[in-house]
A protein has these predicted regions:
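Sec-dependent bacterial lipoprotein signal peptides
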Residues: 1-18
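Acidic (Asp/Glu) and glycine-rich low-complexity loops/linkers
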Residues: 18-50, 54-122, 126-141, 148-160, ...
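A short, structured loop/turn motif at beta-sheet edges
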Residues: 82-84, 145, 221, 241
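Short flexible/disordered coil segments
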Residues: 146-148, 155, 186-190
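Internal active-site segments that recognize and position negatively charged phosphoryl groups
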Residues: 165
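Short, surface-exposed interaction patches in beta-rich subdomains
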Residues: 169-180, 184-273
Length: 273
């Protein structure tokens, strides 16, 4: 009897008739951990991550996935690799403590890839990538996901964050990059070096970046915010709508289309058209 703890929730307005029984001495909950290693036979260059926990992605000479976690979490994880895509998913765990996920339900994933051209990340997990050197890369982060890049070099790059997702990039070098945020998501680039960049924000999205760009196309609407005040751009083409806010910097030429109670602030020596 002492090995079990019975908690009776008496606050009916919050939880009606709820009884939670937890055996804190059950080792399967706390210290029954294991590891799975899987060699990926196909040439994977696309990754879909829909599991709890953290995925680490590094570039290497082989395609290999290693997973560490409690046995119960490992049993919930499914890995499918076919047609050049790797899908990592996890069954929903309905057992929670007052809405908080039970300890041990998350795993740690270590993925080594020769090349990466597409990443789709959704859910409450976290993905940490880099350093990466690729030709083209498309990233979609959604559903409260957190996607972090250390160092990224890509000739052609597209990143989209939506539905409260967060994307953070330490250093980015690219010929052409497009960064898009909407639905309360945000993207933050600490240091970018790019020839041409497209910045698009809508529906309370937040986009911040610093660095250098030859040409910047900036579009914001529906209460979104773009802070490119620390981005040294030669040419800027800018349009704002519906209470959006934009801060930018231009040194040769700037064109502004500002409407619907939006706000634009810019610095530099550019000629305004």
């Amino acid at each position: 009897m002492l090995s079990r703890i019975v908690l009776l929730i008496a606050a009916v307005p919050f939880v009606s008739g709820c009884i939670v029984v937890a055996n804190v001495n059950d080792p399967a909950w706390w210290d029954d951990s294991d590891e799975i290693t899987r060699d990926i036979s196909i040439d994977v260059d696309r990754v879909n991550f829909e599991a709890r926990g953290t995925l680490y992605v590094v570039q290497g000479r082989s395609n290999r996935l290693r997973i560490q976690g409690h046995n119960q979490a490992l049993q919930q994880i499914a890995v499918d690799d076919r047609s050049g895509a790797l899908l990592i998913s996890q069954e929903t765990d309905d057992f929670r403590w007052w809405g908080v996920q039970r300890p041990g339900s998350e795993a740690v994933f270590y993925l080594e890839l020769e090349n990466l051209s597409s990443l789709r990340h959704s859910g409450h997990g976290e993905v940490k990538l880099g350093p990466l050197i690729v030709n083209t890369l498309s990233v979609i982060s959604s559903g409260h996901a957190t996607t972090n890049f250390s160092s990224l070099i890509a000739r052609d790059l597209t990143i989209r964050a939506t539905d409260h997702a967060n994307v953070d990039i330490e250093t980015l070098d690219s010929d052409s990059a497009e960064l898009r945020v909407n639905d309360h998501a945000d993207i933050f680039v600490q240091d970018i070096n790019v020839l041409d960049v497209k910045l698009r924000a809508a529906d309370h999205g937040d986009l911040r970046l610093a660095g250098t760009a030859d040409t910047a196309f900036v579009s914001a609407q529906d209460h979104a915010n773009i802070d490119a005040g620390a981005l040294e751009s030669a040419v800027v083409n800018l349009n704002t709508r519906n209470h959006a806010q934009v801060t930018t910097q231009a040194h040769e030429l700037i064109e502004i289309d500002e409407r619907d109670n939006s706000s634009v602030s810019w610095t530099g020596s550019a000629l305004q058209q």
